[in-house]
Amino acid sequence: MPSAIGIDLGTTYSCVGVFQHGKVEIIANDQGNRTTPSYVAFSDTERLIGDAAKNQVAMNPTNTVFDAKRLIGRKFDDPKIQADMKHWPFTVVNDGGKPKIRVEFKGERKTFAPEEISSMVLTKMKETAEAYLGQSVKNAVITVPAYFNDSQRQATKDAGAIAGLNVMRIINEPTAAALAYGLDKNLKGERNVLIFDLGGGTFDVSILTIDEGSLFEVRSTAGDTHLGGEDFDNRMVGHFVEEFKRKHKKDLSKNARALRRLRTACERAKRTLSSSTEATIEIDALMDGIDYYTKISRARFEELCSDLFRSTLQPVEKALSDAKMDKSSIHDIVLVGGSTRIPKVQSLLQNFFAGKSLNLSINPDEAVAYGAAVQAAILSGDKDDKIQDVLLVDVAPLSLGIETAGGVMTKLIERNSRIPCKQTQIFSTYADNQPGVSIQVFEGERAMTKDNNLLGQFDLSGIPPAPRGVPQIEVTFDLDANGILNVAAKEKSTGKEKNITIKNDKGRLSQADIDRMVSEAEKFREEDEKQRERISARNQLEAYCFNLKQSLDGEGASKLSDADRKTVQDRCEETLRWIDGNTMADKEEFEHKMQELTKACSPIMTKLHQQAAGGPSPSSCAQQAGGFGGRTGPTVEEVD
């Protein structure tokens, strides 16, 4: 039987593997490389794919297309695409709300959909496998980021079909990587594994429980479909464009070829900085004959990307809380994706897990294709001992439900529910003698349906007249392994039934929608949390001031020198005035004021309490004042 292959279709690089003779082979391309750039170039004479396309990019920047994965399944007016367009040398145009790529090919102007560009990369991967296997290949498993929405998944599936592949299954990248890890390491017992997958353009975190290395159960997933190595490159490019402007008074950003040469040098420098603390950039005749020689330190690079690096921890926290686990219950932290080689990313993650060592034992560039190849073998019925017992249980990334009275979203399938799954709930009518109901199906995390995404709707009519709340309407949601939803509604007294299958419609969700749904709720939560922390810091500072002032009126205070008393009095008044004028200051500012005040008043308070001859401290101030002595700010809550 012809082999089925596994393809990791990446933002910047792609990789293909096949399972045969009891093991996975990652297949090298015609250049001898085990990963192939996801690049397609169009020239006056030919189309180039992979290494050949990337190698000529500086000569032909406007007709060399990359990052198709950042366009696929999205709408043209997606803010992420609008932001990316500033960095792309090729032209992206609006075609009926969808982004298309415009190039000059053989002297003609042509436009391609992102699916077509991706299909060209998939064709290259298919040919690479065929050359190795010596036979034609039809069946494939293709991976996508776990946080890809349905339109992105469907578009990826379409790209496979355009490439002449029968896409047996679309599977999630971190799940594929976990499969690679579990089979490669012969795990014993039950282990909770966190997959941290930071690639060229996307970021996923998944938590799985792996039992005896054969049952793989995804517990939760989180991520950002628009974060990766490309964004780190962009920051470095921006830094050098500014530097060039300062030094040479010329704007590189207007020159596509110069910008591309700079980007290639930045990408190389970024890789160097993973093993060295400094990288040198030397580009001859970068612009107007100017040779550009410069250096960048690892510390500067980390500072340029610090917010991006830190943002990788939010999905980790979200995945842990969704899986109802704490940090200590994770046995293995597995790094996948080339960007996890960045030392700062590793140290942030390690510190988050209180110094737990990270697992670097699988190849971060090849693990996803390895897992996809295993899944392809399982789906094509390979009976090899190593994989015949493997069972993979994945989850739905978003909640599914229907609209009930008042526009409320009533969830039937919660996000991170196992798929396939089936849920049934009984609903009733809202008005007396209501003859029918409209079932509207939504996807998303918000409480009201207007903030979520409508997937489809249908009407169930012919309900016998009855007072409100009497008819029983049974609604069933059935989500299959491919993420296709079937919704049925049945009126129990008459047995009348109606159903609808919601396939991954083309127009389901733009990235803007999915970002809005999951991020908005997150964003509001984060803003609330920030506000809470700020108020707490302000209250602690205020309470400390009042406690100090109280102490000056308490017993034993008469023993203080006038100078000391005046110091405390003045500092408190000054701080309280500052608080009144800066109620909206940041948490850090309040903490800084706290440190200053503590530093000034703590020694005086200590003197006061010693003079009180060890008697009970007045009010709660001694604990506060004494407790902060020599520290960097409050670490205890105020006690009544």
Swiss-Prot record:
Record key words, sorted: ATP-binding, Nucleotide-binding, Stress response
Stretches the record annotates as Disordered: 608-640
Stored InterPro entries: ATPase_NBD (IPR043129), Heat_shock_70_CS (IPR018181), HSP70_C_sf (IPR029048), HSP70_peptide-bd_sf (IPR029047), Hsp_70_fam (IPR013126)
A Pfam short name: HSP70
MF annotations from Gene Ontology: ATP binding; ATP-dependent protein folding chaperone
Claim: ATP-binding is one of the keywords in the record: yes
Key word ATP-binding present: yes
Family annotation (SUPFAM superfamilies): Actin-like ATPase domain, Heat shock protein 70kD (HSP70), C-terminal subdomain, Heat shock protein 70kD (HSP70), peptide-binding domain
Coiled coil: none
Top-level division of the source organism's lineage: Eukaryota
Protein's name according to its UniProt entry: Heat shock protein 70 B2
This protein's encoding gene: HSP70B2
